[in-house]
A protein has these predicted regions:
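N-terminal targeting/export leaders
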Residues: 2-150
Length: 150
């Protein structure tokens, strides 16, 4: 009976430590929602883990069917990866925008490598190229000063 009484607190302590460790890992894995004003962005880039610019392009207004403004950039290789290519896009409402939809798509990258997507020198997101060399990211970026979404 004494052994059982001693085991119960030890098991309880181990469970508490395991739950606490899990919660810390979960909280460390969360990141804050990105903010930034890309409504007048001019340059989109894809950089490799060494910071070299693999793809680069200039944003320009694109024709849009709905009531949004869309800016697109054709991403062209810079000599770091000769067959890499991609596109970047920023889309937002014409009237009182609060959120921008930011998209990057790159292909023919080094499979398994990590890339950073950059707009006007500001890191927006990172992604790892899949086994075919494709890397994509799509996210909503809140404009500075815009109310937080629920």
């Amino acid at each position: 009976m004494t052994n059982k009484v001693q085991i119960i607190p030890v098991v309880g302590l181990l469970c508490t430590v395991a739950v606490a460790g899990y919660m810390v890992a979960q909280l460390n894995g969360q990141s804050t929602a990105p903010t930034g004003d890309y409504t007048n962005a001019s340059v989109a880039e894809v950089r490799d883990a060494q910071g070299q610019i693999v793809l680069s392009g200039q944003f320009a207004i694109a024709e849009e069917e709905d009531d949004d403004i869309e800016r697109k950039a054709a991403l062209e290789q810079t000599g770091v990866d000769a067959d890499a290519a991609g596109e970047a896009e920023v889309e937002f409402a014409k009237a009182a925008p609060t959120v921008q939809e930011v998209e990057f798509a790159a292909r023919n990258l080094q499979p398994g490598a990590t890339f950073t997507f950059v707009i006007d020198g500001q890191d927006v997101a990172t992604a790892t190229a899949d086994r075919r060399g494709n890397a994509e990211v799509e996210l909503e970026v809140r404009l500075p000063g815009a109310p937080a979404s629920r």
